[in-house]
């Protein structure tokens, strides 16, 4: 049986990247013409992988990378070799962010997008912390939506989407809202039709743009991982998060301690549902 990580293991990072990018373009060609013409961004998720693999992918043209844990991201982004050999690198944080880890995340070199804002309080904390950093640029943020309604997943209920975006735009001058993010239902059978989670995120963007008078091409959709990224792109994703197909299977015995406290019961999902 084909496995997501086998491509990288057999071909190496460079060949795996080329193969993934080819599949991205194949999916783009199948998108409906009425969708915003945004070239999908490939976020190479390097969690549990060494800095040398990030540098190798960078050497093959990859510039955007993602991490799930604040400590691991801070260590990699601060790595002298990555800083020296990857000056154009852009980091996306794609994991659950607890408020006590916000200041640490804001210290990450070359932090480009925070994809997982899931509350007004978190948005306020990030806004204040980024202001204290004194960056001349606003921090790009996405709002994470729990489109499936599963208790094991983080994210806002769909009904709260417009309210939090209004809050960010009106009350968080140091943040730039750039899109919506979701994790699709694991194991969705495409023979039954498109993933309803992806369709819901599309409809939320349409509603958001209509009510707040925002052009659709200014609201990205981050959805799709190694197992479903082509389908996600076909229905409108502009940002896919892919790890094992590029870097190979993960060894969780070497994974840094996750950014969680005893009360954070949702973190194990990341092991079951792979990027």
UniProtKB/Swiss-Prot annotation:
Transmembrane segments: none annotated. The keyword Phosphoprotein applies. Keywords: Phosphoprotein, Pyridoxal phosphate. It holds the Pfam family Ala_racemase_N. The keyword Phosphoprotein applies. It comes from the Eukaryota. It comes from Pongo abelii. PROSITE patterns: UPF0001. Gene3D superfamilies: Alanine racemase (3.20.20.10). The modification Phosphotyrosine is found at residue 69. The modification N6-succinyllysine is found at residue 125. GO terms for molecular function: pyridoxal phosphate binding. Belongs to the pyridoxal phosphate-binding protein YggS/PROSC family. This is Pyridoxal phosphate homeostasis protein. The modification N6-(pyridoxal phosphate)lysine is found at residue 47.
């Amino acid at each position: 049986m084909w496995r997501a990580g086998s491509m990288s293991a057999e071909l190496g990072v460079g060949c795996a990247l080329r193969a993934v990018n080819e599949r991205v373009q194949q999916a783009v060609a199948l998108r409906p013409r009425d969708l915003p013409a945004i070239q999908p961004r490939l976020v190479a998720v390097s969690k549990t992988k060494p800095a040398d693999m990030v540098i190798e992918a960078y050497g093959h043209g990859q510039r955007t990378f993602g991490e799930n844990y604040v400590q691991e991201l801070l260590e990699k982004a601060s790595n002298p070799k990555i800083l020296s050999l990857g000056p154009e690198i852009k980091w996306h944080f794609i994991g659950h962010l607890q408020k006590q880890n916000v200041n640490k995340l804001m210290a990450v070199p070359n932090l480009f997008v925070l994809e997982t804002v899931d509350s007004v309080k978190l948005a306020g904390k990030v806004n204040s912390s980024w202001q204290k950093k004194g960056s001349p640029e606003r921090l790009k943020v996405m709002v994470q939506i729990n489109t499936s309604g599963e208790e094991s997943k983080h994210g806002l209920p769909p009904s709260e989407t417009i309210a939090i975006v209004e809050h960010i735009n009106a009350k968080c001058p140091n943040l730039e809202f750039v899109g919506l993010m979701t994790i699709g239902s694991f194991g969705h059978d495409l023979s039954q039709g498109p993933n309803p989670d992806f369709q819901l995120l599309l409809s939320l963007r349409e509603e958001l743009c209509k009510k707040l008078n925002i052009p659709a091409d200014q609201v990205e959709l981050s959805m799709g991982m190694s197992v479903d990224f082509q389908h996600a792109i076909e229905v409108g994703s502009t940002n896919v998060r892919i790890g094992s197909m590029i870097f190979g299977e993960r060894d969780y015995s070497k994974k840094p301690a996750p950014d969680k406290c005893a009360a954070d019961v949702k973190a194990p999902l990341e092991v079951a549902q792979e990027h």
